[in-house]
């Protein structure tokens, strides 16, 4: 199983609902590296790196998000892995 990198944009009610903190917790549980941040337009951006199956699981989680989120759309772009270490909230 290879290492993959996914670049996500998550839309809907995804700010002010604990999305970043919850994604960080899920990523650490799954052993996925990367980062997550809020964007000025109200969306959330994230980069996920890890084993394909684990990254796919976190993308699946992102379609639902934490309990108070209302995700309307998730865009995924696949990129070359860059060697992310840990999972952090960057903004």
From Swiss-Prot:
Residues 5-91 form the Acylphosphatase-like domain. Keywords: Hydrolase. It holds the Pfam family Acylphosphatase. The active site is at residues 20, 38. Transmembrane segments: none annotated. The keyword Hydrolase applies. PANTHER family: ACYLPHOSPHATASE. Its EC number is 3.6.1.7. Belongs to the acylphosphatase family. GO terms for molecular function: acylphosphatase activity. It is an enzyme of class 3 (hydrolase). It catalyses: an acyl phosphate + H2O = a carboxylate + phosphate + H(+). This is Acylphosphatase. InterPro entries: Acylphosphatase, Acylphosphatase-like_dom, Acylphosphatase-like_dom_sf, Acylphosphatase_CS. It comes from Pyrococcus abyssi (strain GE5 / Orsay).
């Amino acid at each position: 199983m290879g290492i993959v990198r996914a670049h996500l944009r998550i839309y809907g009610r995804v700010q002010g609902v604990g999305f970043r903190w919850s994604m960080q917790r899920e990523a650490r549980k799954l052993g996925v590296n990367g980062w997550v941040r809020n964007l000025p337009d109200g969306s959330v951006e994230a980069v996920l790196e890890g084993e394909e199956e684990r990254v796919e699981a976190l993308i699946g989680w992102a379609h639902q998000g934490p309990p108070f989120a209302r995700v309307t759309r998730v865009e995924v772009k696949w990129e070359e892995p860059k060697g992310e270490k840990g999972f952090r909230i960057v903004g």
